[in-house]
């Protein structure tokens, strides 16, 4: 089925009692269902709360400017406005913080300031920020072998890999991140996490993993030496999360709550989706409000705000990889589960499929958050246009 933009009539997904249009379990993250589903994960999948605690809410002051008519280019390079680009790129929420103040905030597609939106792979950066806190306390040494903390992985492709290799996604573990192939490794992650059922008509002899750790233990092969090259593989984040749980004796959701979310001054409790073993899906299962994603970005911009170690953030901004490792980031790199847009500005980004973005820029003192529900997993033209728009906003 085709998707729909915010300017187009919306189909009655989950409307009525009982609703006539219900997202299918196999395709809830595909169009048009994802336009509803990314804001209603708790109605689709089992989740665990990331409690905000009883502390204060960090109030975001407002210094609003109407950026709707700001001239920008659309995904085809043609003139449009910011409002037009947000419509073209299936935006659910868009937030601009400048000097920690709300400059621009827009909600679409039924989203509100209290709605939790699926992060997709922005969860990796949230998880890694708490990982950095544990490193700062001396609980984890990034130079140590992964098997120091997870000895079971000695029989897997991670044998001989350092923790830093996993943080930077430069381990040599063979893993296919082919989103459209249900039998790929990432397709098996969907089944292991409980995001999807076993595909109908699948080979009865094929053994599908029942939870994430079982899948990790089954990844026996390497495709290259550890440290030889960057290759984006979501499963690396799940390995990091198991290390965090092992050294702390706490589950991931509790760690993120105690070490980050309660100290952030969040508006709302967040949540993770969980697998059948109760494991919070670190690689993409986090959900939070638009403003709370902004607060997280601002915390990173404030060099950790005394929560995440400043030296961890500085090290994160210094990633180095070869050219053209990402079609939408020709000068980019990757470090500690964050994307670096360009080595000159060293702006950090949290990115997720279907158009999720937190852009953190020290030069402009800006944080930009875009939550979306693209019709496709990735769209280079949309991503490039969005980044150009972020820079246009900085000059406005």
Whereabouts are the PLM-identified features?
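Active-site Gly/Thr loop motif
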Residues: 267-270, 314-367
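Active-site helix/loop module of the DD-peptidase/beta-lactamase fold
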Residues: 118, 136-179, 218-221, 235, ...
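A short acidic/small-residue loop/turn micro-motif
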Residues: 108-112, 116, 374-377
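Short, charged, amphipathic alpha-helices and their helix-cap/turn boundaries
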Residues: 82, 101-106, 145-148, 183-226, ...
């Amino acid at each position: 089925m085709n998707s729909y933009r915010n300017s187009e009539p919306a189909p009655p997904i989950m409307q009525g009692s009982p609703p006539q249009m219900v997202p299918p379990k196999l395709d809830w993250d595909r169009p048009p269902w994802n336009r509803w589903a990314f804001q209603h994960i708790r109605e689709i999948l089992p989740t665990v709360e990331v409690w905000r605690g009883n502390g204060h809410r960090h109030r975001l002051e407002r210094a609003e400017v109407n950026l709707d008519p700001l001239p920008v280019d659309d995904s085809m390079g043609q003139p449009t406005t910011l409002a037009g680009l947000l419509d073209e790129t299936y935006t659910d929420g868009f937030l601009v913080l400048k000097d920690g103040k709300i400059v621009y905030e827009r909600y679409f597609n039924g989203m509100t300031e209290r709605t939790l939106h699926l992060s997709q792979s922005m969860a990796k950066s949230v998880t890694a920020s708490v990982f950095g806190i544990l490193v700062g306390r001396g609980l984890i040494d990034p130079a140590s072998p992964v098997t120091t903390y997870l000895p079971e992985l000695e029989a897997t492709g991670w044998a001989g890999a350092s923790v830093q290799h996993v943080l930077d996604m430069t381990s040599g573990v063979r893993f296919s991140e082919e989103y459209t192939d249900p039998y790929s490794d990432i397709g098996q992650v969907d089944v292991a996490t409980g995001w999807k059922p076993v595909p109908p008509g699948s080979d009865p002899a094929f053994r599908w993993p029942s939870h994430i750790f079982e899948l990790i233990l089954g990844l026996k092969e390497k495709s290259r030496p550890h440290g030889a090259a960057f290759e984006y593989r979501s499963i690396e984040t799940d390995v990091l999360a198991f290390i965090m749980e092992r050294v702390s004796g706490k589950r991931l959701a509790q760690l993120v709550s105690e070490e980050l979310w309660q100290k952030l001054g969040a508006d709302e409790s967040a949540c993770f989706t969980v697998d059948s073993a109760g494991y919070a899906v670190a690689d993409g299962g986090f959900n939070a409000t638009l403003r709370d994603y902004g607060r997280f970005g601002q915390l990173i911009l404030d060099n950790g705000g005394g929560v995440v170690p400043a030296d961890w953030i500085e090290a994160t901004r210094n990633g180095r990889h070869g050219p053209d490792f990402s079609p939408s980031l020709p000068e980019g790199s990757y470090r500690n589960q964050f994307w670096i847009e360009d080595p000159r500005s060293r702006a950090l980004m949290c990115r997720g499929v279907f158009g999720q973005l937190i852009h953190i820029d020290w030069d402009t003192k800006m944080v930009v958050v875009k939550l979306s529900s693209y019709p496709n997993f990735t769209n280079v033209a949309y991503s490039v246009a969005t980044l150009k728009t972020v820079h246009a906003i900085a000059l406005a």
